[in-house]
Amino acid sequence: MPLHVEVRGSGPPIVLLHGFTQTGRLWGSFGERLQGDYALVAPDLPGHSGSEAVRADLPTAAELVAEAVHATIGKEPCVLLGYSLGARLGLHTLLGTDLSVRRVVLIGGTGGIDDAAERERRRQTDEAMAAELENAGDIGVAAFLDRWLAGPLFARLPRSAAGRDERRRNCASGLASSLRLCGTGTQEPLWGRLQALTVPVLALAGSDDNRFGIHALRIAACAPNAVASLVPGGGHAVHLAQPDHAWRLVDHWLRA
């Protein structure tokens, strides 16, 4: 089953891969700024919104992304920009598909969890959240989103920028599937493969997002053409909370 894709704007293509509980439309004013200069190719990822019936792990989702992009823009080289879940999926797309990518932006990204015991603990946490979603059904999605967005990852994200209405387009079964199949606990660690990347990579994170700031620096150390940039005072969803600052960093790097 193909992914649902929307294209907005015109110009060189940027493929946008959203985060967990989001949709291809949820890029806020950051996306609007990009749309002024680029064609935004924005799929709904497996288990989300228009792709809610799609069930796929990260390697399979990467193939679906490549197929969707090829069906939309052909073989034209693109910029690949992913946030959180989308950043992890972006790495799988780079390493496991034939998508022609000229530059990559990873916001709040990671190469995965190295330690097997920690990875299993994360898998169990994701499974518990998936079961919670399934037990509550679609009527419980709003309450789940409130708890999700109240977590420490999003402490810096203003309520007005969180996109709750757009997130509510998701269904319980789709989100549960995403947690089970694409959660960090089920992801193969990719750190040892990043040295094979030759495409330029910008790893972006908020300076107050300690864990993912460390991941950004590690990505820059592992991939030969990667650089890291930390947005002062930024949290995990830095492109939504500080869209102008994030856009300036990304735009400057894309034009360099």
Where are these regions (language model features)?
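Gly/Ala-rich beta-loop-alpha elbow adjacent to hydrolase catalytic centers
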Residues: G82-G86, G90
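Conserved HGGG/HGGXW glycine-rich cap/lid loop of the alpha/beta-hydrolase fold
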Residues: L3-E52
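Active-site loop/oxyanion-hole signature of alpha/beta-hydrolase fold enzymes
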Residues: G28-E32, V41-L81, R248-D251
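Catalytic histidine-centered segment of alpha/beta-hydrolase-like enzymes
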Residues: G234-P243, W247
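Short beta-strand/loop motif that positions the catalytic acidic residue
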Residues: L197, A203-A205
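Flexible "cap/lid" loop of the alpha/beta hydrolase fold
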Residues: L95, R102-L133
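Conserved alpha/beta-hydrolase "acid-adjacent" motif
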Residues: N210-H215
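Conserved alpha/beta-hydrolase catalytic His-Asp/Glu region
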Residues: E120, E134-R193
